[in-house]
């Protein structure tokens, strides 16, 4: 019994440790081509660059939406991008697929490409991108287009032909289709089909109910192609990208007739030196700082609930009660299996989209157990052990549970705001979680999964589940609610805080403020599809085209 207790503790540690290390490429290192690095000519360190006094557009945040947005706007207008992080060559490890898990590990130093924090719900390991290209440079590379529900319910007046064209603009540069999948992924795909997650949709980027293999922003050699490469499509004469430039606040002018309008932004470099830069007539400041950064910048600049701002001694520019509200994160429910034989590390291109709303994704890893705690369980000289693991990740789509964001600091934007998502506060979300777990239960009974069972001394076969066991009765609401709340983790698919028809209008202009727009996931009330990065990059391109069309019409009227 003591031995089993030790093994259980070991397995629990392995679950945490190996999830953090579970994507490693088998491919050799290959350098970026010159064409892919053309955008480097546009990048300047903030402490080495003196900006012009004014630009047509200032994009705050060179992330997943900001890069395609800036590249598009630069076709006809001058654009300045202000990015708080460095570029990928300050963090060369983020380029390779084998380093993905390490990049997602909690990072606390101010120079890391990701910034970690814990939600007020007590869920740890949430991260914000802090690198040019944003979260597209530190994620797992899964690429899939948005779903119909998303497009019908965002409040944005989409032109679906333009949406399709914008997706294709992104995909021709960044997206790769896996030629094949690993043994584990093939087994999971077969199991999903066996339990009725139908039809088999093959290899597609579209969001379709059933089982499919999707795209990836990692190529066949294991190199990442993030949103930063979309800057290669820019007009280099019109675009300047400043890294290690942290925007502190937005400055407004005000008149009784027109209300507040953006005048300029204030930012500082890595040495703490402050700069101010303005916008030209008919220009805009566009926030693309993400679901945490964009509402945070509005709040520190005096746009938000007046009572909260006053309590922090922030001068109120515009009373906007919905800034920081409707914060949503899709809950993730994990099932981890120790496998009886070595497997090839795999990404996440296989997904099952169930008819009940939940999505099932998967990955596998073979992790060397060389952690600092090994000597505690295996006296020296302890043998190296490769732990093979298979994972199921269940995603609750379109959760109805929502929370809010508020400032920890009234002036220091380097401090991530407090955020509470209220995971599983609504019964609809618990039912989706229960559906995902019930699907796991069915999957474990399929022929496709038989090969992953262990045998005990009596010849009985069993799965070695690592972590909390699935409840015996998945139809019991209370036991499932407890299970879901105790096992919840993040899918990193945050949205909200500047939602449409609350903070911004259908054209993503901040209501009541002139010259200010928000273009990123903070305007969404649900995360698009199985993974938001495709739609977030599409949004940047889509809005860049739309803004130019608006501007051309406006200039033509003058």
From Swiss-Prot:
Transmembrane segments: none annotated. Pfam families: GMC_oxred_C, GMC_oxred_N. It comes from the Eukaryota. Its cofactor is FAD. Confined to nectaries. Involved in the production of blood-red nectar containing the alkaloid nesocodin and that serves as a visual attractant for pollinator visitation, including vertebrates such as Phelsuma geckos. The nectar is initially acidic and pale yellow, but slowly becomes alkaline before turning into red within 24 hours. Together with NEC1 and NEC2, facilitates the condensation of sinapaldehyde ((E)-3,5-dimethoxy-4-hydroxycinnamaldehyde) and proline to form nesocodin, a pigment with a stable imine bond. Catalyzes the conversion of sinapyl alcohol to sinapaldehyde. It catalyses: (E)-sinapyl alcohol + O2 = (E)-sinapaldehyde + H2O2. The active site is at residues 493, 531. It comes from Nesocodon mauritianus. Belongs to the GMC oxidoreductase family. This is Sinalpyl alcohol oxidase Nec3. Disulfide bonds join 433-484. Pathway: Alkaloid biosynthesis. The keyword Flavoprotein applies. Monomer.
């Amino acid at each position: 019994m003591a031995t089993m207790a030790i093994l259980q503790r070991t397995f629990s540690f392995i679950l945490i440790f190996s999830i953090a290390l579970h994507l490693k490429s088998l491919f050799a290192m290959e350098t970026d081509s010159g064409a892919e690095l053309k955008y480097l000519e546009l990048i300047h360190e903030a402490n080495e660059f003196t900006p012009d006094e004014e630009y047509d557009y200032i994009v705050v945040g060179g992330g997943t939406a900001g890069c395609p947005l800036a590249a598009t706007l630069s076709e006809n207008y001058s654009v300045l991008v202000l990015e708080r992080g460095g570029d990928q060559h300050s963090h060369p490890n983020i380029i390779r697929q084998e380093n993905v898990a390490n990049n997602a590990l909690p990072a606390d130093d101010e120079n890391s490409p990701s910034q970690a924090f814990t939600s007020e719900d007590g869920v740890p390991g949430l991260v914000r991108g802090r690198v040019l290209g944003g979260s597209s440079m530190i994620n797992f590379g899964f690429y899939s287009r948005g779903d119909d529900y998303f497009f019908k319910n965002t409040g944005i007046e989409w032109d679906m032909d333009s949406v399709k064209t914008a997706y294709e603009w992104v995909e021709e540069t960044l997206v790769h289709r896996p030629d094949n999948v690993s043994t584990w992924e093939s087994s999971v795909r077969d199991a999903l089909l066996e339990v009725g997650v139908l039809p088999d949709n093959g290899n597609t980027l579209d969001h379709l109910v059933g089982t499919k293999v999707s795209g990836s922003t990692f190529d066949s050699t294991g190199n990442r192609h993030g949103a930063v490469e979309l800057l290669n499509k820019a007009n280099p004469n019109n675009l300047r990208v400043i890294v290690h430039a942290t925007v502190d606040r937005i400055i407004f002018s005000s008149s009784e007739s027109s209300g507040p309008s953006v005048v300029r932004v204030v930012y500082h470099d890595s040495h703490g030196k402050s700069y101010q830069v303005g916008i030209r007539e008919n220009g805009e400041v566009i926030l693309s700082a993400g679901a945490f950064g964009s509402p945070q910048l509005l709040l520190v600049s005096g746009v938000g609930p007046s009572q909260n701002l006053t309590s922090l001694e922030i001068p109120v520019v515009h009373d906007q009660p919905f800034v920081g509200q409707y914060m949503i994160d899709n809950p993730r429910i994990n099932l981890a299996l120790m496998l009886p034989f070595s497997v090839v590390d795999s990404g996440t291109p296989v997904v099952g989209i169930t008819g009940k709303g939940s999505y099932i994704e998967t990955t596998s890893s073979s992790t060397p157990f060389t952690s600092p705690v090994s000597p505690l369980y295996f006296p020296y000289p302890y043998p190296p052990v490769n732990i093979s693991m298979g994972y199921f990740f269940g995603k609750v789509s379109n959760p109805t549970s929502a929370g809010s964001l508020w400032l920890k600091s009234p002036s220091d934007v380097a401090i991530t705001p407090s955020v509470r998502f209220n995971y599983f506060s609504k019964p609809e979300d618990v039912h989706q979680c229960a559906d995902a777990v019930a699907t796991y239960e069915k999957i474990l009974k399929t022929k496709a999964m038989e090969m992953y069972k262990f045998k005990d001394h009596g010849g009985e076969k069993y799965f070695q589940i690592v972590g909390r066991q699935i409840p015996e009765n998945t139809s019991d609401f209370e036991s499932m609610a407890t299970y879901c709340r105790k096992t919840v983790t993040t899918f990193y698919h945050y949205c909200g805080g500047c939602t449409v028809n609350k903070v911004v209008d259908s054209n993503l202009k901040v209501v009541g403020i002139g010259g200010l727009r928000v273009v990123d996931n903070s305007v969404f009330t649900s995360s698009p599809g199985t993974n938001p990065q495709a739609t977030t990059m599409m949004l940047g391109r889509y809005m860049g085209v739309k803004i130019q069309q608006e501007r051309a019409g406006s200039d033509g009227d003058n």
